[in-house]
Every structure is written in C-alpha cells, then in structure tokens.
C-alpha cells in the first residue's frame, strides 16, 4: 500500500464538476458507484483512511460522505494546505526530504488543489483536470472526474492491477 491516508476533492474529482440546478434552486450532483466502492470497501480493506476536503458547502456532500462512512469531511475549506497541516499534527505525519507528507495521497482537479497536492507524497488527477494540476500529478487517471478516476487512483495506491 502506497498511502495510509487518501484526501479527496469533490467537485470535478468525485463528481463530473457540473452542478445541476432544479427549478426551485435545489442542487444535484452525480457520483460514480465505482468510486464509492473504492472509497467504502477497497481502500479501508487495505488499512487506509479516506478524508474529504472541499471548498464548497453542500448537504449533498455531507450525505454522500455519511453513506460511504467517511468520518472526516471538511466543507467550505479554501485553504486546503492549511487543513492538511492541521491533520498532519492530529495524525503525527512525517515529511520526506522534499517536504511532502509521507503516506498521504491527494486527488484533485483544479488550481485550488495545487498547494495541497504539493504537500502530498502521492498526487492524483482525473484525466480532465486543469493543465496546471496535470503537471503536478504523479498519477493521472485514464478516467474523468466523476467517472471512476478515484477508483483507479485507489487501485493504483493499493497495488491492484487493472
């Protein structure tokens, strides 16, 4: 197993990045079932813990995290790197010579994710992530965000051949 902790962005990573709005203003997001299986079953069965950090706030995200048994999810966080430093203290994480937290993986898709990505030993990106994020990634999924990219990253981290 390459990482003990997997931190995930939501919009554009766990979803396709689109927000669907109903007539009454209700928001909808779609999540991939394969990503859910990777988060709920595969990664924890290999001894890993999944954490969600997202800049937006949504009851939808809270519901999905609860459904997948993600105990640590943080919404409305614009400075994700700062949140990682807080988590590093909580979990007593160590850094390598490059200043990256050991045994920590992050997957994100847009420029807001770059500062936290640079702090993680393993950095994943969906195929359709922004150009800048793709440059920082150590793993680029063959799948788009919201279409199994997270599952593919989890399989990579767990050493599962696909």
List PLM regions with ranges:
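Alpha-helical substrate-recognition element adjacent to the catalytic core
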Residues: 1-78
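Mg2+-dependent phosphoryl-transfer enzymes with acidic/Ser/Thr/Gly-rich catalytic loops
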Residues: 28-29, 67, 81-162
């Amino acid at each position: 197993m390459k990482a003990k902790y997997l931190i995930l962005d939501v919009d554009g990573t766990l979803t396709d990045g689109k927000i669907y709005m109903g007539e009454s203003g209700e928001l909808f997001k779609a999540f991939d079932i394969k990503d859910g299986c990777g988060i709920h079953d595969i990664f924890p069965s290999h001894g890993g813990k999944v954490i969600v950090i997202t800049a937006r706030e949504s009851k939808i995200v809270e519901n999905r995290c609860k459904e997948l048994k993600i105990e640590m999810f943080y919404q409305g966080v614009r400075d994700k790197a700062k949140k990682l430093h807080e988590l590093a203290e909580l979990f007593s994480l160590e850094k390598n010579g490059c200043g990256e937290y050991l045994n920590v993986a992050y997957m994100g898709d847009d420029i807001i994710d770059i500062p936290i990505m640079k702090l993680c030993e393993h950095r994943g990106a969906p195929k359709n992530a922004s150009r800048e994020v793709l440059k920082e990634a150590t793993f680029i999924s063959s799948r788009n965000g919201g279409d199994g990219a997270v599952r593919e990253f989890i399989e990579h981290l767990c050493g599962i051949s696909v």
